[in-house]
Amino acid sequence: MKKYMVILLSLSLLLPLGSASMAATQPVPGKSTVTIHKSPRVITRKTTGQKKTQLSAESHRKRTETGQKQSAGQMIEVGLQSGSELSLTGLSAFHVEAGSSLGSYPAGTRLTISKSGNGLSVNGKSAGAKIYFKSSGSGAAFAVKGNQYRGVIKAIASPSGVTLVNQVSMEDYLKGVVPCEIVPSWQMDAIKAQAVAARTYAMFHKNGYRSAGYDVTDDTRTQVYRGVSAETEATNRAVMETAGEVVTYGGSPIDAVFHASGGGYTENCENVWGSPVPYLKGVPEDKYATPWKKTISLSSFTKMADVGRLKGIKLSALHIGEAHKTSDRGISGRVKSVTLVGSKGNRVVSGNRLQQIYDLNSTLFDLSVSGNQLVITGYGYGHGLGLSQWGAEAMAEKHGGAKDYYKTILMHYFTGTKVEKVY
């Protein structure tokens, strides 16, 4: 017999019809409070029910084959900016090529690139449909939209006019990614786990935007990348000390997705994106569940419910940090569906839909009534799949010092995997 928590709105009480353990949660000891999840340094993708690439066995095979073929090159192309007219500034001496040399320029030179017929022009001079800006230095080479980048800048004609692409080595790319996706002052094993996950993710998704002329974006559609401008000593160290290492399943790089906090337990892929993936399974983590709360009016919720007079809400009990077996929650306790009971009948609303409507940090939540308010008490931040960044930090704090412990962290969150050096 299923055990449910039923909110009887006429009584404005939370009446448990089964035992419910709402364990108290604590922030990571000795670190910043959980409000750090509001910071862009920790990934804040609240992916819900929107369309996500379905990782079926066949699609996964094709993507991993691509990743294997590309790994030997160790280069990646990142889309930086598109527009009708763009500019860049050389931070050291550089030259411009478009099949042949278009000239050399001293450090500090600013060039403007714009659409010209079917091609491009540089400072008003026609130059072809593809232009390369190459620096003679090895450090920060170019400034684009306020950030500094290593490597080569490629300009290509695009529907919007011109697109600037950064051609850079995989390791230099990661130096500009990792500090944007995690807190650089965290434990080194947590940072290394993020570095390996980011490398693996980039390899798996390489060529994902090839139709636009590059491999990955510089924003949360893939991974946030800010080039040299974002680099720190700690994150650079993590990248270099794990150079060439990726997470593999069956010998192939995985889709190493990550999120800020699992809230005590991560989730199975099929409960978030619809299709099972063998290495994206829910696993328990230290109960640093990063609690959050949101309050909305019962009148607005009743209007959204569209079931007439709202009589009650049916949702099974939440047990933080424990595996769940009820049909309305995923294994972690993330809400799959809520039943709204009304005078016109019942309506089932998905947890993803509620997350979208009310901009919730996650679908790991419980519901209660206080007066004329509906209180949503939640835990965790993000979709709950794969690597939990706060969970990784908690593991690193507890077991820090063990040799290569970041590999243990990764293999905990990505079930049945290995960490291997592929180049």
Model-derived features: positions:
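Soluble non-cytosolic domains of exported or imported proteins
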Residues: 168, 185-193, 295, 382-386, ...
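Bacterial N-terminal signal peptides
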Residues: 8-16
